[in-house]
Amino acid sequence: MSNNSKNCAVILAGGQGKRMKSDLPKPMFEVLGLPMLDWAIRACEDAGITDICVVTGFNHEVIEKHLDGKYHTVFQPQRMGTGHAVMMTIDWLKERADGNVLILNGDAPFIDKDTILGALSPVSYTHLTLP
């Protein structure tokens, strides 16, 4: 298993949720009494990952207010896809180049600690370099 102190997470939380017909960002919709974003954050923390960057987009102020400065946020002003959202975190990621990065969707409430730990375990022998 990888060293959790060197793991960080990027949570993509810029979705609008057009089909939900609301001004609330999609990751802020509640499932079992908690915003979906909180489920993703909780799973990371339960897996020992506390270094978290949340990428915001649609109605970003709602998410930033909800997070209350507890996590680093990056605003993606134009939603140009998942890859672009991750690219918005490049400066944050460069400061963490010696660790593993987990990328999660902020609207996936059923991720859990065991899934995260399982996803990170094979990366102990993999190394990617940032451009």
Map each language-model feature to its residues:
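Conserved N-terminal catalytic core of the sugar/cofactor nucleotidyltransferase
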Residues: 1-8, 34-105, 110-118
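N-terminal nucleotide-binding beta1-loop-alpha1 segment
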Residues: 2-22
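Short, glycine/acidic-enriched capping/hinge loops at junctions between secondary-structure elements
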Residues: 21-24, 64
